[in-house]
Amino acid sequence: MFNTTPINIDKWLKENEGLLKPPVNNYCLHKGGFTVMIVGGPNERTGYHINPTPEWFYQKKGSMLLKVVDETDAEPKFIDIIINEGDSYLLPGNVPHSPVRFADTVGIVVEQDRPGGENDKIRWYCSHCRQVVHESELQMLDLGTQVKEAILDFENDVEKRTCFHCKTLNYARPQSN
């Protein structure tokens, strides 16, 4: 039997806000065809997710910043997209993106289940020269845990974090200046 119980988002947030923890801060509400996630802020990550399918963002509380890389030209362009409270945004598939969520913010993200044989990637760009430092490829089976595992793997490996081009040591989490 399929699920017949609606979820009251406001009530769920009051009862479960402790589940939205760094570095990803997400909780999967629904799975099956699509994954519906509640995502809180602040988050602590520098990697860019590359999803082979589109992602839909809805900002329920506060604003967020979606950092994207436009790779349609020979020279990639790093672009910041502000998604304000009440806004929705549909990100096309295969666009590198890094959601920046601020304190006391809440969003909803909907991702389509991946077609067979299509993998997600988590990519880190050098903070100094913007070249690709490391990329992890994974068959996305559990959004609630796999992104976090990729972040921790990068964070714990200095070799993966060191830029081949300029030798800058990069980090999995933003560093205060």
UniProtKB/Swiss-Prot annotation:
Other comments on record: Present with 2330 molecules/cell in log phase SD medium.
Catalytic reactions on record: 3-hydroxyanthranilate + O2 = (2Z,4Z)-2-amino-3-carboxymuconate 6-semialdehyde
SUPFAM superfamilies with a match to the protein in the record: RmlC-like cupins
This protein's record includes keyword Methyltransferase: no
Binding site for a divalent metal cation: C126, C129, C163, C166
A Pfam family assignment: 3-HAO
Required co-factors: Fe(2+)
Disulphide-bridged cysteine pairs: none
GO process terms (BP): 'de novo' NAD biosynthetic process from L-tryptophan; anthranilate metabolic process; L-tryptophan catabolic process; quinolinate biosynthetic process; quinolinate metabolic process
Cell location: Cytoplasm; Nucleus
Keywords, ordered alphabetically: Cytoplasm, Dioxygenase, Iron, Metal-binding, Nucleus, Oxidoreductase, Phosphoprotein, Pyridine nucleotide biosynthesis
Organismal lineage: Eukaryota, Fungi, Dikarya, Ascomycota, Saccharomycotina
Highest taxon in the source lineage: Eukaryota
Protein residues bound to substrate: E55, R101, E111
PANTHER family with a match to the protein in the record: 3-HYDROXYANTHRANILATE 3,4-DIOXYGENASE
Oligomeric form and interacting partners: Homodimer.
Function of the protein: Catalyzes the oxidative ring opening of 3-hydroxyanthranilate to 2-amino-3-carboxymuconate semialdehyde, which spontaneously cyclizes to quinolinate.
Record-listed E.C. numbers: 1.13.11.6
Record-level GO cellular component terms: cytoplasm; nucleus
Cross-referenced InterPro entries: 3hydroanth_dOase (IPR010329), RmlC-like_jellyroll (IPR014710), RmlC_Cupin_sf (IPR011051)
Protein name: 3-hydroxyanthranilate 3,4-dioxygenase
Entry binding sites for O2: R45
Organism: Saccharomyces cerevisiae (strain ATCC 204508 / S288c) (Baker's yeast)
Family assignment from sequence similarity: Belongs to the 3-HAO family.
